[in-house]
Amino acid sequence: MFVRVKKAAAALALGSFAVAGAVSVAVTPASPAGAASSGSTVTIADLCSCTGPEASSISQTSDTMQAWASWVNSHGGLAGHQVHLVILDDGYSAAKALTNAETAINQDHAVALFDNSDEDPSFAATVQSAHVPVLGGQESDSGYKNSDFFPAGATFNYTNSVGAIFAKDAGVKKMAAVYCVEVAICAESVHQGQVVAAHYGIKYVYVSSIGFAAPNYTAQCLAAKESGATAMTVGDASSVVEHVVTDCAAQGYTPRELSGDGTVAAAWLKIPAFNGNIDSQADNLWFLHNTATSTMYSALDKYAPGVPSGPNFGEIVLQSWSDGALLQAAVKAAGASAATPLTSAAILKGLYGLPTGETLGGLSPALHFVKGQPANNSCFFEMGIKNGKFVALHGGTTICAPLVKAGTLPTSH
């Protein structure tokens, strides 16, 4: 229902951001794959699609992970080990993404990886065979199919189900869906969305692919209007969503806009046609200032002030921060200390041993991982736009879609 491009959220006008370096100045000595460096430094790698037609928002995740590492290091590190963060950009190349993962594991000797890549299927088998845990994947097929991925929130297989629940509650019966032609998952999400939506009495009456570089989307807007759709989902980068919504409004067509996760951006608040927008989020809501988000905001304000003040500050930032918080929770659950090396095996032990109902201090729905099984979490947060402001819906609590077998997609309930 909520067709989304994984991590393709912010305005493409932001330009590109590519990093292959470290937050910490410490150099990681050579050591076996999955083993921590000697001394008090541990390497973590952030694999990202930092450049490409759908990825300018990834600069926010890189800045966020750097801020996370700096904050952790200034507060004692991971169980006494200083974090050496390496950020590797695949540029939307599957081959490069695989090379980056191999480099992170075999050369940088990273004991854990953050997934900010749209090409993660290319390295999923590699990281699994190396037994190096991947933190993240809330917006990824790998996040619910591969047991080596540990999403710090709801899993992607339930996105359309919970989107259909939200749409039904809003009285939607006819939907329009336009989606990016550049990334395969866009079309795949639409197909699955149609199947799930039908169970909730919602029909997709107009579906069309769009290109991010199109001069306008007037034709699609007029066709969607003619179809009688009262709601629309745009599976593309945030700037493209803005363009579509603005073009449709110019044609006198203002359907309720449905979206979620990384797509939502602060710039939407200035566009009247977004009023009434409804979004699903795999983690808690980034715009809330409360005990759950206080540490994130403190770290961003100190180490990456351009992130929260930017026009495209959004949920993708909180998701990335949550991935870091999950790693911290796993290290704590493993009982790691500065006296012993921090290894991939220890982190995996901690991930499987998280306390029952772990929410990372309120950042996520309750998390639970089972050894040998992919993550399976159907609980999302709901938000929207009302009178030019982001608002938490459903009392700020989660709404859960019916569970299906781990590693599978819901088709009907």
Predicted segments, located by residue:
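C-terminal region of N-terminal signal peptides and the immediate post-cleavage residues
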Residues: 19-40
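Beta-alpha junction/loop-to-helix N-cap segments that form part of ligand/metal-binding clefts
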Residues: 36-41, 56-63, 75-143, 210-217, ...
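An alpha-beta-alpha
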Residues: 50, 149-212, 230-231, 318
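Hydrophobic alpha-helical segments within soluble ligand-binding/sensing domains
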Residues: 97, 151-176, 187, 215-218, ...
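Periplasmic-binding protein-like
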Residues: 104-117, 135-137, 174-179, 228-238, ...
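Extracellular/periplasmic bilobed ligand-binding domains
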Residues: 130, 189-286
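Extracellular/periplasmic periplasmic-binding protein-like sensory domains
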Residues: 247-321, 396-400, 410-411
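Segments of small-molecule ligand-sensing domains
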Residues: 307-317, 328-392
